[in-house]
Amino acid sequence: DKPDLRIDLTATNVSSLFAGSAFEVLADKTVKAVAISNCALTRKQIDKLLADVEVQTGSKACWVKVDENGNLTGGVSKFLTDCKDALTAKLNLKPGSFVCMAAGKKAVAQKTAGVIRTMLGKRIPGHFDEEQYALCWIVDFPMYEIGEESGALEFCHNPFSMPQGGLKALEDAEGDMDKLLAIKADQYDLVVNGYESASGAVRNH
């Protein structure tokens, strides 16, 4: 929730491509892919990237390249033959493209993909503009989430924030888990170049 917008890469949700897949690493999980074209990373550089991602996030990432004939090669390519065409179309892959993927529970995959995006953007020339200040407001935070360990309803960020729609939003959602999870918090962050520089909220009243 604090993207560095100086980087022009994006993380794409490709989870649906691996629903029911025989490849358990990606099957039936949230899968986020960061694709980059004309990538000349060596195997040593790729291994270093994956190692650095694991150190920072505690999660493993996987990768494939696209060869001059448009075929997937390297990394986990041998497990992706069934979804090669769909993955190529979804990510608009071309010869020379490199794809790095993160998989797991939603929050884990999102965090890991964010780290992959940042590392690739800063390591490969042409994808990171150091000369600009990129500011953005982060809004519409979910009020609640299902805790990954507890399995129960938990506050996502700040329990003292007012829900968007006021107390009526809570009253209308009482007893309905889907409605509770759809409630947004009335809070914000201001992000500058990937760093949270300010935050605020309407407090409960």
Where are these regions (language model features)?
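Class II aminoacyl-tRNA synthetase catalytic cores and aaRS-like
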Residues: 1-205
